[in-house]
Amino acid sequence: MIKDKHMPALQGMFPSWITSCSSDGEPNTTVISQIWYVDENHVALSFQFFNKTKKNISENPYAYATISDPSTLKQYNLELKFDHEETEGELFDEMDMKLQAIASMTGMTGIFKLRAADVYKVCLLYTSDAADELLG
């Protein structure tokens, strides 16, 4: 599903968006710094502050994300399904280390606390038609 051509869009150069929906249909869109590559069928989001997103996902495990390739400006849409959360291990440690580095560089040490690495299955990944039209 996730190919080499998608990797630049998963490096965190441009913010990404995640949209979730509560069980009663109320949507919530949040801008996030990065969507992490886990393997060709999974991505992870850092769970820090997203209380509304986390609540929505507990009610409805499906989400929609958009990532952007910084070199081509192509946008890719990902249809996701929550799989599991990790609160320790290699993925969690890698995400926590990067989060702490970002906090340190922005003068926000101690503000960001990674609570979990939320892992999602990528159900569908496709190019945004609007980006294709803009890029010709």
Feature locations, PLM:
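A generic local secondary-structure boundary/capping motif
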Residues: H6-M7, S33, M105-G110
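Short beta-strand segments
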Residues: L10-F47, A65, Y76
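Leucine-biased recognition of intrinsically disordered, low-complexity hydrophobic segments
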Residues: L134-L135
